[in-house]
Curated annotation (Swiss-Prot):
Disulfide bonds: none annotated. Pfam families: ELFV_dehydrog, ELFV_dehydrog_N. Coiled coil: none annotated. L-phenylalanine binds at residues 86, 278. It catalyses: L-phenylalanine + NAD(+) + H2O = 3-phenylpyruvate + NH4(+) + NADH + H(+). This is Phenylalanine dehydrogenase. Gene3D superfamilies: Leucine Dehydrogenase, chain A, domain 1, NAD(P)-binding Rossmann-like Domain. Has been used to resolve racemic mixtures of D,L-amino acids to yield enantiomerically pure isomers for pharmacological and peptide research uses.
Amino acid sequence: MTLTAERHDTAQPENAGVFERTDFPTDTAHEQVTFFQDPATGLKAIVAIHDTTLGPALGGTRFYPYADEAAALKDVLRLSRGMTYKSAIAGVDLGGGKAVIIGDPATGKSEALLEAYARFVQTLGGRYITAGDVGTNSDDLDVMGRATDYVVGRNTSAGGSGDSAPMTALGVFQGMRAAAQAKWGTASLAGRTVGVEGTGKVGYQLIKLLLADGASVVATDVNAAALDRVARDFPEVKIASSVIGQELDVYAPCAMGATLTDESVAAITAQVICGAANNQLAHPAVEHDLGERGITWVPDYVANGGGLIQVAGERLGTSADDVRAQVEKIFATVVQILDVAKRDGILAGAAADAVAEARIAAAR
């Protein structure tokens, strides 16, 4: 069934599951929320389209074992709204959407389920374009591509743009350089110490860029294999059990979200924070604490937009060179955001939202 933000039918029992309800709250500002299920494969999925002012809604499909259907709905509503802002700030002609598949990908994922999901995506007629996210990868997207035209992020062998980690890392690097310029008067990171938390695909690529720019790097990761790879490939990198609390100029959270807590902010010595992780703030008041300490934070959805720009380019037929040039413009975007924040006496997060909202408003 398809439920829109305008629809609000008769009340249902409070313990009814999402797939058993016919009511929907009217205060989400989403254009469309669609619930899909396929009993034959066990598929239960939700697609949320937040805003299509700038173009079709783009956002990844998250395959995750949510505690219940209400938790899945809450997550997809939050994530899809975030994608609207991420697309707007990245300068791509796409809107914001997201999808979740409820279940454990380790045990519940199958080609039949992915194809069933993709057939449902196809029925949306291009209003929503899917991509990878937690629990889905390029191989899964290749499978989806058998049943829908509206998927990006596939392997190059399947006509996709391939791994987006290098472009994501480049965007973070450019955001970091812009913050450095605002903080120290120069965009160069030469002689600066950067703590990279998370040395997976994006963190690894970021370390390469930092070292090439002359920075010293301290790195940590809960994944021993990922950290071993960094130690092997970049012997000049200092390996640590934690980077928070180290003497740093820049902190780059590139792993899980919510690492910026009341406690961690009190321990951070860095004057710039810019990383690839999503949802870095444990709660909104943390950004106020960062501002009180004079720490420049680059909003995560701005810094990590390089991957989005790449997959958007795949959909729009943009050349690799043009994609790279657009990712490098994240530098100018961050400069603009920090200038707005300083001029208006607001936090960087609010300034980023204002810039994104202005672009959306101009297109209406």
